[in-house]
Amino acid sequence: NSGIHVAVDTCGYTTSSKALEVLKAADLLLFDIKGIDPMRHKKNTGKSNEVILQNLHLLSEMRKPMIIRVPVIPGYNDSDEELNGIADLLSTLKSVERVDILPEHEFGRIKYEQLDLEYRLKPCPVSAERQDAIRVMFEAKGFHTQIGG
C-alpha cells in the first residue's frame, strides 16, 4: 500500500503459508519452470515438481502477473518435446505476461563453492541458433518471448 512495486523471483517450491502470502501479495512474479516431467524433475533437482505446478496454477487463477523463466539446461530440458510440454502447460495459465528463455550459465557455481559442495553441472552452452529456435517455438504458441531476463 506504500506505492512500491514488489516483484518476487521464485521456483514456486513452497508449502509454507507465509511464503504463499508473500507470493500472493507481490505485484509481479518471476516464476522459474525447469521442466514438467515429474520423474526427470525429481531425478535432477531432488524434489518433485508437484508443489511447484500446484502453486503455479493457484497464482494463475488469482490472475497474478507472471514472467515465466525457463532455464534451458542441456541434457535435462532442452529437447523439443520437453520445451513444447512447458509451452503447452503455460498455455493453460491466465496471467503469463512473458516467457524468458534463460541460456545455461554457471552463476550458481559460487554458491556451491561457498557451501563446499561439488558443482556437478558441466559447462554446456546453448548455441545462439538453438536459443532463437526455442524463442520461435514459444512465440508460435502465442507468448511474448525474449532470450535472457
Please report, for each region that a protein language model flagged, where it lies by residue.
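Short, flexible active-site recognition loops that position polar ligands and cofactors
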Residues: R120-R130
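A cross-taxonomic marker for long C-terminal extensions/tails that follow the last structured domain
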Residues: R130-G149
